[in-house]
């Protein structure tokens, strides 16, 4: 379904279909696509369409690859228009994960993507001798942009363990190909460490890792660093609309900085922390929305002007005393409103406190789920925690915690966990509800985290699950 939404959003004119999609049969999928996406004028099918397809209705627009090739290679190249190419031309449409709605098509240029690769290459000191294990999907900016562009710049090898994430296959590839680096989102590292073959896998060749894509509690980063082990673990922050990363740790940063911040801005990026609704810059060290401008910034959400204007905004205050000023040509700078809440410390490190839309308001108090998740994961029995707002008649919202127990551990009581949270946090930040993965015999609570296509834990799915639990 997510793939269909992406196709609808792009409104393509030609679609090339392989002999079969993963898990699906083309004879069933293509008629659905043809019906839902009227913009498609021609299907080019890499298969024997006469044998397998009834070419009636929507599929009458189909042609085999061989026929399409013979029809179009006969054209005289001299008659084709000569189109100049600019570094700022769109080269890739990358889709956001779509966890909160229809995936948005992000238009990125040669300039965006290759500068991202150059940043990663310089920061990690990658060389042509490196072998990168990349279990992150290529439809995600982490895989497509960070993985491919940085390896292209460095000349390093890429190992793609499996067509979808598989912890066992990833560990096999690390040992088989003597990988020197491993990339992933937090849930991937957690799943790899929990895999039964982890302790038996030779991981001695790994020199560094890159972790990004979701909240990263300090306790989790400490576990990953020591378990693999990873001499250099680079934590990063970014988003698809910024050509992936805008901040990254440096290997000379202290362990405390590497486990509690998302690093500093890359060169040629500028950022502010502002009030979400007004765009007014907040005092240094105070929380607000992180807005970014720079050479990784997308040009638009393709064919979505309204969404583009909502995300990329001008700030008149830039021209006021103390503002960042105009661009070299005198025009106002466009800022990408990221939706992430955070602040800069006195040394310029970015500290993420959560997603603005994930904030829970309990009795008038704004509560960041990430703060409580970080505390819960410090408990010796908990591998991973997710905090969700639960509708409540008295307080508006209460706190609910979904938890994953560490293998071989005894499950603590709800009261013990509340006391544990209150040792470091305010009393009202202790969750009222606790749910453990796989704890319901009726199957209402799954044994594994619901995830987006890019491997992140899906909080919208957890919110929907709460409705059936209360």
Enumerate the language-model features and the residues they cover.
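AMP-binding/adenylate-forming catalytic core of the ANL superfamily
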Residues: 3-8, 13-19, 182, 294, ...
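ANL superfamily adenylate-forming
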Residues: 17, 21-87, 468
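Conserved AMP-binding A3 loop
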Residues: 84, 91-115
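Conserved AMP-binding/adenylation subdomain of ANL enzymes
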Residues: 114-131, 139-181, 191, 195-196
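Conserved ATP/PPi-binding loop(s) of AMP-dependent carboxylate-activating enzymes
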Residues: 264-268, 280-323, 365-367
């Amino acid at each position: 379904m997510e793939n269909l939404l992406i196709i609808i959003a792009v409104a393509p004119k030609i679609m090339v279909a392989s002999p079969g999609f993963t898990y699906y049969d083309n004879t069933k999928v293509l008629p659905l696509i043809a019906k839902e996406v009227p913009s498609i004028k021609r299907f080019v099918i890499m298969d024997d369409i006469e044998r397998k397809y009834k070419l009636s209705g929507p599929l009458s627009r189909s042609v085999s690859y061989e026929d399409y090739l013979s029809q179009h290679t006969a054209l005289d190249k001299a008659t084709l228009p000569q189109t100049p190419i600019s570094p700022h031309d769109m080269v890739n449409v990358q889709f956001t994960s779509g966890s909160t709605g229809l995936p948005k098509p992000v238009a990125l240029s040669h300039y965006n993507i290759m500068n991202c690769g150059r940043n990663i290459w310089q920061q990690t000191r990658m060389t042509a001798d490196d072998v990168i294990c990349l279990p992150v999907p290529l439809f995600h900016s982490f895989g497509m942009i960070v993985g491919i562009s940085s390896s292209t710049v460095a000349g390093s090898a890429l190992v793609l363990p499996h067509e979808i994430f598989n912890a066992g296959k990833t560990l096999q590839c690390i040992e088989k190909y003597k990988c020197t680096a491993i990339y992933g989102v937090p849930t991937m590292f957690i799943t790899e460490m929990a895999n039964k073959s982890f302790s038996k896998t030779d991981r001695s060749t790994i020199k560094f890792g890159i972790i990004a894509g979701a909240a990263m509690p300090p306790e989790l980063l400490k576990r990953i660093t020591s378990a693999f082990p990873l001499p250099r673990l680079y934590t990063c922050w970014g988003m698809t609309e910024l050509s992936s990363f805008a901040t990254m740790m440096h290997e000379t940063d202290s362990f405390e900085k590497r486990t509690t911040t998302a690093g500093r801005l890359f060169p040629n990026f500028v950022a502010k922390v502002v009030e979400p609704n007004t765009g007014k810059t907040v005092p240094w060290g105070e929380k607000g929305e992180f807005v970014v401008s720079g050479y990784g910034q997308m040009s638009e959400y393709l064919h979505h002007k309204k969404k583009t204007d909502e995300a990329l905004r001008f700030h008149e205050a830039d021209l006021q005393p103390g503002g960042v000023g105009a661009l070299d040509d005198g025009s106002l700078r466009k800022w990408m409103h990221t939706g992430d809440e955070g602040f800069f410390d006195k040394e310029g490190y970015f500290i993420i406190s959560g997603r603005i839309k994930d904030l829970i308001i309990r009795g008038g108090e704004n509560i960041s789920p990430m703060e409580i998740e970080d505390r819960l994961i410090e408990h010796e029995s908990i591998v991973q925690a997710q905090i969700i707002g639960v509708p409540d008649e008295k307080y508006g919202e209460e706190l609910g915690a979904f938890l994953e127990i560490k293998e071989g551990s005894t499950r603590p009581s709800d009261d013990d966990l509340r006391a544990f949270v209150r040792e470091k946090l305010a009393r009202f930040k202790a969750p009222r509800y606790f749910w453990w993965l796989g704890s319901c015999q009726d199957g209402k609570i799954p044994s594994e985290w619901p995830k987006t296509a890019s491997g992140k834990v899906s909080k919208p799915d957890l919110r929907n699950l709460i409705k059936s639990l209360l």
